[in-house]
């Protein structure tokens, strides 16, 4: 939380607030509430349902346009009902990370407790053994009230309180009328000498009706007024169904969705004789300074000539830890200056924008010699820090394969973190595969070429390169396509180098994309080359079916694609899963072989998944080939609308 000092209170029916002390400081961003509805048995059915929740709920929430998911898993008495809501100003990647961390924190801070609520800055999580009504009145069950320790001064308090009430009510109105996200942010001009602006944020769960959302927020406004939060320098009331927040500094991402004018400014005082004298004095100073301009320009020219050398020196110094001299030499040749990239992208203009992810924004650029590049400009608030940047640089600079994206250069000037890659005209696989119109560009030949190319790229990483590398974040959006739809694996920020005799690593920092993670990695932090094999299996099924790894698929349940594929495979109906846009223009035996390989790659035990060299052998084989037998994969089923009252 971006605050100097906040005090908290829990208005939680049957919930205990776990805090070692108040006030809450910057280091404490998590507020867990542990319920008293009973405990579950470790390794029992309810515990297993929580584990399924951990692997699936982050995907469902982060892939939703509203960054919201609710549902249930299992049957009574071990059914678990879950709800996750990410703040409307966050992005999909940050949403998935926050929800996953909240689930993990819930189990660590409220061990074996059936009902838990976790409030984080960017997401809210609740799971319990009973459904949670879609009602404003249910918001007080597990509510947290937090306020800034400092009051505003008595001189401005009346005007400040009136401004806060006006702002939070207007923001609440905006959020209630947002039919997709039920989210709003606002700012109001106040007083240049004390608080230039006041900022606010309001949000409800998107499954609430507009009137119910506004009623829920109205209750919070009342609590803020009666509790004298509006006279503080900041305050928030957090509930599972709705929340409201105001500060005297911008605390949300992006521009405010609404702006309110402040009080009319006082008229400027008339110009006095003293003012005229001051103006004349400034003119005299300017006239005296003019002869020095030539000297200043000469100094600037000398500085400019040394800039390129210093840029390279800075980049090498930034990346020097844990890097050998050879690595640094290979990196130094990749340094690009910021002005070149600004010129190439028209100063990072919107019309050059290709897309946006959890790291920041990607732009199309044109270098002076005519080369087209993709410029990945990491946001200042990006989770991808200097270590991830260093990993990507030092790995990609050493790798050379037709199915891996090629790094063109890097820029670290002025606190920027920018990577430039070869430009891929067809962008990422997900932009075609999950687009109802563009998917028609991919006939079976193109799809099989993409599957083959990804498999060859992974074999190079795992077995054939001078390094043994686990990518850890293989997914459709990290597979780029050139003009001929040849695939290239990209984004090595999470990649890890393995020793040649190393088979498995355990990490406490689980990073990647839920839905593509293997069970042993998502649940226990264990990863190996077989993590990438699992992700590849998911990709194969997505490419063949044209479907994401999660969705309703015409039923009253949200299920993952692995589950749907397995059910069709064991019923000898796998042919029904093939993307309808292919028509009948595909070789049935080859498609079924690819489905078999996809299911083989998502086997629950890592040892049962093939090496990528074996996958490539299976893909390139002709005629009848006996493939290994399959076991039932891991998957999760979520009932739609299960949290409705």
UniProtKB/Swiss-Prot annotation:
Localisation: Membrane
UniProt cross-references to SUPFAM superfamilies, sorted A to Z: Protein kinase-like (PK-like)
Cystine bridges: 86-95, 98-123, 204-213, 216-242
Induction: By benzothiadiazole (BTH).
E.C. number: 2.7.11.-
Gene Ontology annotations for the cellular component aspect, listed alphabetically: plasma membrane
UniProt domain Gnk2-homologous: residue ranges: 28-132, 140-251
Binding site residues for ATP: 354-362, 376
Membrane-topology descriptor: Single-pass membrane protein
Active-site residues, record numbering mapped to chain: 473 (proton acceptor)
Signal peptide start-end: 1-27
InterPro entries from the UniProt entry: GNK2 (IPR002902), GNK2_sf (IPR038408), Kinase-like_dom_sf (IPR011009), Prot_kinase_dom (IPR000719), Protein_kinase_ATP_BS (IPR017441), Ser/Thr_kinase_AS (IPR008271)
Extracellular side: 28-283
GO molecular function: ATP binding; protein serine/threonine kinase activity
UniProt entry keywords in alphabetical sequence: ATP-binding, Disulfide bond, Glycoprotein, Kinase, Membrane, Nucleotide-binding, Plant defense, Repeat, Serine/threonine-protein kinase, Signal, Transferase, Transmembrane, Transmembrane helix
Cytoplasmic side: 305-645
Glycosylation positions in this chain: 39, 91, 151, 169
UniProt cross-references to SMART domains, sorted A to Z: S_TKc (SM00220)
Keyword ATP-binding listed: yes
GO BP term, pick one: signal transduction
Ranges for domain Protein kinase: 348-619
Spans through the membrane: 284-304
PANTHER family: CYSTEINE-RICH RECEPTOR-LIKE PROTEIN KINASE 10, RECEPTOR-LIKE SERINE/THREONINE-PROTEIN KINASE SD1-8
Sequence similarity: Belongs to the protein kinase superfamily. Ser/Thr protein kinase family. CRK subfamily.
Role played: Involved in disease resistance. Required for NPR1/NH1-mediated immunity to the bacterial blight pathogen Xanthomomas oryzae pv. oryzae (Xoo). Required for the benzothiadiazole (BTH)-induced immune response. Probably regulated by the transcription factor TGA2.1.
The protein's name in its UniProt record: Cysteine-rich receptor-like protein kinase 10
Organism of origin: Oryza sativa subsp. japonica (Rice)
Lineage: Eukaryota, Viridiplantae, Streptophyta, Embryophyta, Tracheophyta
Gene responsible for this protein: CRK10
């Amino acid at each position: 939380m971006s605050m100097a000092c906040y005090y908290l209170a829990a208005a939680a029916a049957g919930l205990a607030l776990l805090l070692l002390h108040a006030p809450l400081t910057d280091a404490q961003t998590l507020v867990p509430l542990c319920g008293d509805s009973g405990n579950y048995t470790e390794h029992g059915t309810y515990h297993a349902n929580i584990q399924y929740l951990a692997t699936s709920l982050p995907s469902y929430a982060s892939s939703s346009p509203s960054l919201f998911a609710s549902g249930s898993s299992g049957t009574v008495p071990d059914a678990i009902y879950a709800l996750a809501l990410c703040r409307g100003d966050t992005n999909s990647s940050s949403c998935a990370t926050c929800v996953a961390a909240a689930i993990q924190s819930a189990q660590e801070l409220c061990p074996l407790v059936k009902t838990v609520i976790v409030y984080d800055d960017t997401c809210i999580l609740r799971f319990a053994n009973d459904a949670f009504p879609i009602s404003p009145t249910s918001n007080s069950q597990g509510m947290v009230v937090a306020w800034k320790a400092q009051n505003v001064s008595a001189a401005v308090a009346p005007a400040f309180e009136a401004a806060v009430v006006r702002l939070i009510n207007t923001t609440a109105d905006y959020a209630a009328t947002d039919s997709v996200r039920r989210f709003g942010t606002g700012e109001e001009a106040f007083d240049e000498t004390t608080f230039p602006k006041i900022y606010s944020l309001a949000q409800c769960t998107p499954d609430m009706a507009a009137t119910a959302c506004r009623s829920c927020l109205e209750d919070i406004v009342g609590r803020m007024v009666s509790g004298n939060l509006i006279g503080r320098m900041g305050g928030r009331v957090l509930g599972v169904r709705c929340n409201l927040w105001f500060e005297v500094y911008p605390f949300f991402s992006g521009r405010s969705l609404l702006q309110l004018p402040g009080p009319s400014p006082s008229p400027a005082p008339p110009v006095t004789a003293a003012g005229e004298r001051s103006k004349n004095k400034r003119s005299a100073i300017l006239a005296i300074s003019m002869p020095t301009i030539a000297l200043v320009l000469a100094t600037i020219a000398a500085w400019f000539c040394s800039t390129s050398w210093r840029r390279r020196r800075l980049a090498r110094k930034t990346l020097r830890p844990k890097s050998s001299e050879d690595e640094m030499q290979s990196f130094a040749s990749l340094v690009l200056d910021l002005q070149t990239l600004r010129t190439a992208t028209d100063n990072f203009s919107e019309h050059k924008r290709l897309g946006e992810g959890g790291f920041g924004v990607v732009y199309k650029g044109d270098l002076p010699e005519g080369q087209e590049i993709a410029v990945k400009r990491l946001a200042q608030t990006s989770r991808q820090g200097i270590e991830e940047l260093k990993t990507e640089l030092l790995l990609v600079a050493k790798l050379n394969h037709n199915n891996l994206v090629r790094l063109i250069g890097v820029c670290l000037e002025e606190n920027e973190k920018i990577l430039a890659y070869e430009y891929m005209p067809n962008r990422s696989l997900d932009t075609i595969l999950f687009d109802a119109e563009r998917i028609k560009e991919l006939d079976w030949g193109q799809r099989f070429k993409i599957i083959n190319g990804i498999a060859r790229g992974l074999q190079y990483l795992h077995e054939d390169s001078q390094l043994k590398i686990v990518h850890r974040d293989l997914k459709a959006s990290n597979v780029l396509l050139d003009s001929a739809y040849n695939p290239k694996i990209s984004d090595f920020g999470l990649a890890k180098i393995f020793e040649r005799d190393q088979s498995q690593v355990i990490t406490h920092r689980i990073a990647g994309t839920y839905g593509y993670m293997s069970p042993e990695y998502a649940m226990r932090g264990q990863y190996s080359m077989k993590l990438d094999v699992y992700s590849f299996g998911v990709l194969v099924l997505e490419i063949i079916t044209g479907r994401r790894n999660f969705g309703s698929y015409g039923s009253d349940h949200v299920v993952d694609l692995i589950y749907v594929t397995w059910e069709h495979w064991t019923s000898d109906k796998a042919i029904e899963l093939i993307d309808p846009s292919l028509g009948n223009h595909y070789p049935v035996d080859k498609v079924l072989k690819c489905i078999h390989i996809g299911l083989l790659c998502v086997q629950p035990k890592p040892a049962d998944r093939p090496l990528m060299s074996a996958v490539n052998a299976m893909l390139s084989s002709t005629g009848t080939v006996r493939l290994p037998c399959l076991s039932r994969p891991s998957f999760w089923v979520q009932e739609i609308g299960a949290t409705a009252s």
